[in-house]
A protein has these predicted regions:
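Short S/T/G/P-rich N-terminal loop/turn motif that feeds into the first structured element of a domain
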Residues: 17-103, 109-119, 134-153
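Bacterial N-terminal signal peptides
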Residues: 7-13
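Hydrophobic alpha-helical membrane context
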Residues: 14-15, 122
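N-terminal soluble domains immediately following signal/targeting peptides that reside
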Residues: 99, 125-126
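Hydrophobic alpha-helical context, especially transmembrane and signal-peptide helices
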Residues: 6-7, 101
């Protein structure tokens, strides 16, 4: 995990070259914003653990992140999705697999927000350890510090 964090910080530092300070950036998702999206497939008998983590993470986000202003992290979007996993995602009548799908998405205007988020998150050791364990156990895809490539501007 430390190697992932170091790689992410390196990418963020490189990506920040020539960017406006956070105070001069409009708080709107646009091409070039940076974000996270992590997808989990969780057996139905383990969803209580994931739900507890989501509650803890949302509380962390509300306590430490901002929706506007100059102080990072300024989160442009934070959302969590939850749905039963269907045998055929395009056919709601296909039945369920016995798993629940979760998607966690966060978007920041630039690398400063992502970096501030990572720093604050790692300071909450129990929450971060639970995220690492859940990710190692249930994560099927993750975009970390990825640029937005299309947005409704």
């Amino acid at each position: 995990m430390k190697n992932i964090y170091l790689a992410l910080v390196s990418i963020l530092l490189f990506a920040s070259c020539g960017q406006e300070p956070a105070s001069k950036i409009e708080n709107k998702i646009k091409v070039g914003s940076l974000g996270f999206h992590v997808s989990f497939v969780v057996p139905n008998d383990a969803t209580e653990r994931m739900d507890q983590f989501i509650t803890t993470h949302e509380q962390f986000m509300r306590e430490t992140h901002h929706l506007s202003g100059d102080q990072e992290p300024i989160v442009l979007s934070y959302s969590v999705f939850k749905s039963p996993e269907l045998n055929n995602p395009f056919d709601p009548n296909s039945g369920e697999t016995g798993n629940t799908l979760y998607g966690l998405t966060e978007i920041y205007s630039g690398p400063e927000g992502v970096q501030a988020h990572m720093t604050l998150g790692q300071q909450r050791e129990a929450m971060f350890a639970e995220l690492v364990d859940l990710t190692n156990t249930y994560c099927v895809a993750g975009l970390l510090g990825a640029p937005v490539i299309a947005a409704m501007e």
